[in-house]
């Protein structure tokens, strides 16, 4: 896990350096989805997909909470479907501190970065700002970073609690959901590429730190014989 943290921190620093030195990469990435009629991928079927992905983290933690309450009430649930309290704390803290506090409370309302649909390069009234500039004209719910992408990458947390034979495929699936959500946010003109990359990296770092603190080594996930969860 410490190796994962080092890798994630290094990727975050590298991402920051690349998009600070070449901020036009954000404009070029968003321009791939922009045409004469605006952001062409803003279509009903893709909006429906976005809505499903948006509510997926809430559905997942709701399912964990329901299973935990069911086990607490003595319902005859299979061992693999009986999460322990420490697992639920891990998931709840990850969702509250990552997509909740860090992204939506601290960053989005205080970084002042205009969204792609708001900047002059794509027909909006505001001036583009690189990710490291906090003097943009956006006032609230701004572009840096992507809340939906952060929530989607949080799904790595419950995926990491899967039984060992299923853990790697579950984590890979969660990462795929995160990447898909990030691409959709760029395609809709809601965020620049750096917004979604930072959202994913920040969330993965937080999940890794919480997992190190709350989940004991070699006693992870939904294992029924785990006395520590």
What is the role of each PLM region?
Residues 1-68, 108-115, 120, 127:
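N-terminal transmembrane-helix/juxtamembrane module of multi-pass inner/ER membrane proteins
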Residues 21-22, 66-80, 159-166, 209-215:
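Structural signal for the C-terminal ends of transmembrane alpha-helices
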Residues 2-12, 128-229:
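Membrane-embedded catalytic cores of phosphoryl/pyrophosphoryl-handling enzymes
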Residues 41-55, 79-83, 162-169:
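Juxtamembrane loop-transmembrane helix junctions in multi-pass integral membrane proteins
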Residues 15-20, 96-101, 176-186:
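Aromatic-anchored segments of alpha-helical transmembrane domains
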Residues 53-61, 89, 194, 198:
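Alpha-helical transmembrane segments of integral membrane proteins
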Residues 70-110, 171:
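Interfacial segments of alpha-helical transmembrane regions
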Residues 20-25, 101-106, 188, 204-209:
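Transmembrane alpha-helix boundary/anchor motif
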